[in-house]
Amino acid sequence: MWFKNLTLYRFNKPFAVETEALETALADFTFSPCSSQDVSKFGFSNALGKKGSSLVHSADNRHLICVTKEEKILPGQVIKEALEEKVALIEDEENRKMAKKEKDALKDEIITSLLPRAFSRRSQTHALILPELEMILVDSSSATKAEELLALLRKALGSLPVIPLSFKAPVESNLTEWLKLGSAPLPFEMQDEAELKSEADEGGIVRFKQQDLKEDEVLAHLATGKQVHKLALHFGQSIALLLQSDASVKRLKFSEEFRAGNDEVGTDDPMARLDADFALMGSELVALMHALVAALGGLEEAQV
């Protein structure tokens, strides 16, 4: 359940859906496994996984939701070879060239015949709805997966006025300034990894890892006009992260010491531990968002 990435969105209007109403809305779009002829299925599932019993898990007016996606695995090469074999057979028997429309229809038939025997894979994406911040945090490094979750949530609720998080000043401008100064605003602490990009169309990209970012070798790239687009940070003693210029957070990791705060909770009750972990994670992510917005100079004014 501990989030590992953050794709960030904000509401244009206050989110005022209560837990019970949210649960009811999601219930019409619950996940069900693929049938023999389904290519994929997508829907809401228990927020706390197999041990959970509800689509929404809430604490302190913070709501955790989860979507599950199942996809049939049909390798393109398998389809291509089957199609070529079938086309060659028909063209040889009928002594003619098949039209593109016929080949497309034949391809659909082949896919239909292969689906019942295809393996499938499942993936899950969680999101945290934070009415107090008017934000949604999606635990995904993929903007596409985040948008899929939001699209289904929008369908369930009827509307979902959200936009990607954006700041008054470009994130890369702030990251570049921090690197020049040799430190990030408290409670953030700069680590030993960064990615710098030239603003020129065909400019270069330089990556530093396990290196002192205050060294002249690093700062020299700033003098040539490069800007920082990725920067590794620590948030206090609780979270390590990689902040990117698109305002997304990658490689989010809660420290063992921080997570150990719940070690004595739920030793005999796994649900109690999950509930405690969610409350702990939620409160720290709220603190992280407050600090991040302040460090980056505030959010851009929302367009209603």
Swiss-Prot record:
The record's subcellular locations are:
Cytoplasm, Nucleoid
Tell me which InterPro entries the record gives. Answer: RdgC
Intrachain S-S bonds: none
Query: What keywords are assigned to this protein?
Result: Cytoplasm, DNA recombination
Q: Which domain of life is it from?
A: Bacteria
First-listed, main subcellular location of the protein, grouped into a coarse class: cytoplasm
A GO biological-process term: DNA recombination
Q: Which Pfam families match?
A: RdgC
Molecular function (GO) terms for this protein are:
double-stranded DNA binding
GO cellular component terms listed in the entry, alphabetical order = bacterial nucleoid; cytoplasm
Q: What does this protein do?
A: May be involved in recombination.
What family is it from?
A: Belongs to the RdgC family.
Protein name, please?
A: Recombination-associated protein RdgC
